[in-house]
Amino acid sequence: MTFKDKVYIVTGASSGMGREFVKQVSKKEKFDEIWVIARRKEALESLKKEVKAKIRPITLDLQNPEGFDTYKKLLAEEKPEVALLANIAGYGKFGKYDEISLEDCRGMIDLNCKALVAMSQLTIPYMKRGSKILQLDSLSAFQPVPYLNVYGSSKSFVLSYSRALNRELKTKGIRVMSVNPGWVKTEFFDHATKSSNDAITYFNVMYDAKDVIKTAIRDLYHTKKDVSIHGFQIKAQVLLVKLLPHKIVMEIWMRQQKHK
């Protein structure tokens, strides 16, 4: 296949981590265009005023299967060389199991897992040696987390999928890295905790999206890591989770949240 323009593709680019990623990554290596994908057209359009790079807003609902038909056709028509795919779109609802609707449960799986896989599968054929895939994951991927049971499980899937895919694509010279932050103050966080009532009340440390993204980009371009973790406390927590039985880890979490 003969490729045309060299592009970056970023999902979830309308706000939070995705928007911050676009701002920072636009200053990296030379490329022709950044395709920014999200549902809110106005928010995507406004990125043009904040980023000097050429931006192409693409309004898609990644929870709707028809969105992938549109994306597939766009790739076939444009035939871009995709130097970077950043799957940052995500959906979370935190709280007690009976306070989260079935619609939200299915929505988390659809966007966090199914959409991420679909974007990866459709995009890889347009990548060359040296291309990269970044998957926004979560600290919750490393352990079972009560009151984040569906969200955390969806992120465990992302971690396993990303690491396995990274190994598969090694011979093609395509890199896959998951980014596993702790608590980050964003619009996503506000939405996820909005209906959690008293289920989650303790947040040990809150990070800034700018710092998490800065670390992620550094790790993506200057290391061979398949997992990026920002912050000493989060790195220590990941190590602890690996050393202790998950039953004990869950008990510690429950006590932190003041649940029996």
What are these regions (language model features)?
Residues S14-S15:
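Conserved glycine-rich cofactor-binding loop
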Residues K30-S46:
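Conserved glycine-rich Rossmann-like NAD(P)H-binding loop of the short-chain dehydrogenase/reductase
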Residues I88-K93:
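Conserved NAD(P)H cofactor-binding loop of Rossmann-fold oxidoreductase domains
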Residues K96-Y97, D104-R106:
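Substrate-binding pocket helix/loop in short-chain dehydrogenase/reductase
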Residues S120, S154:
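Active-site helix of classical SDR
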Residues S138:
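Residue(s) in the substrate-gating loop at a strand-loop-helix junction
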Residues T171-F232:
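SDR active-site lid
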